[in-house]
């Protein structure tokens, strides 16, 4: 923000501090997401925010950005066994993998005619032929869809899957990913002491997303896979790679 008028920024900062500081659910202030708060211009903006928080709301923690020193955002979609290799990271602040959500809830927001040919959702024409489906697909990016379907193909045939088939397969594939991820991170204790999967719950109806609970409040299989890793006594299989191929 080198060219941003800092007096305007400071007025906006103060307005939002006064607006939000009495909210009991507010636990921490954060300057932003996945940007460099120390670069020219950004450092001045973060300094103004930090100074005003120290004056007007000094009881809450302030983080310049996420991730910052000691934390990491990571999306190694291919193999969750990689997480065990992050043994020097104190806190994994954001990570996860896509899956299709509950079919019954999807049918409430997407026309039946669009719930076909889902195996080709990374094709160029998919957006034109499935506008409602794509509209409710959180962070739709054709380059990432094959990774989700590749993982699901280990569970079932993804050539021309029915909605129920692709939902079950992607959720189980993602659930396996979350389980191995959590086990790997927990095994790095006491260096790694925190894991925050992205995201716990979507606030609106979605057909596919990185989430544990969909917008209708329905937990995906990923929720239960992850929850199981926090049982009092949990046994894990320590493998170098989840997938092996000749």
PLM region descriptions:
Residues 2-3, 173:
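Active-site mouth loops of central-metabolism enzymes
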Residues 29, 83-246:
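Substrate-binding clefts and catalytic carboxylate motifs of secreted carbohydrate-active enzymes
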Residues 1-2, 167:
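Alpha-helix N-cap/helix-initiation motif
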Residues 11-15, 44-52, 180, 221-228:
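Alpha-helical scaffolding segments of alpha/beta enzyme cores, especially the outer helices
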Residues 4-18:
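Alpha-helical scaffold elements lining the catalytic groove of polysaccharide deacetylases
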Residues 3-7, 37-41, 213:
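Alpha-helix capping and helix-loop boundary segments enriched in small/acidic/polar residues
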Residues 14-128, 191:
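Active-site region of glycoside hydrolase catalytic domains
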């Amino acid at each position: 923000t080198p060219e941003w008028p800092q007096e305007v920024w400071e007025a906006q900062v103060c307005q939002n501090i006064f607006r939000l500081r009495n909210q009991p659910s507010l636990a921490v202030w954060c300057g932003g997401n996945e940007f460099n708060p120390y670069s020219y211009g950004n450092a001045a903006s973060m300094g103004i925010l930090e100074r005003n928080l120290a004056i007007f709301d000094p009881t809450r923690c302030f983080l310049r950005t996420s991730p910052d020193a000691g934390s990491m955002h990571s999306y190694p979609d291919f193999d969750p066994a990689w997480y065990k290799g992050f043994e020097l990271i104190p806190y994994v602040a954001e990570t996860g993998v896509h899956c299709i959500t509950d079919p019954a809830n999807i049918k409430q927001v997407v026309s039946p005619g669009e719930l076909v040919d889902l195996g080709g959702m990374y094709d160029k024409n998919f957006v034109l032929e499935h506008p409602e489906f794509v509209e409710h697909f959180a962070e739709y990016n054709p380059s990432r869809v094959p990774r989700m379907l590749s993982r699901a193909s280990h569970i079932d045939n993804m050539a021309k899957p029915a909605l129920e088939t692709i939902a079950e397969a992607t959720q189980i594939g993602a659930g396996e990913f979350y389980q191995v991820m959590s086990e790997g991170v927990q095994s790095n204790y006491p260096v790694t002491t925190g894991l925050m999967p992205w995201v716990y719950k979507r606030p609106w109806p979605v057909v596919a997303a990185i989430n544990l609970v969909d917008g209708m409040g329905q937990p995906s299989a990923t929720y239960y896979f992850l929850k199981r890793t926090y049982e009092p006594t949990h046994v894990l299989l320590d493998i170098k790679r989840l997938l092996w191929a000749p």
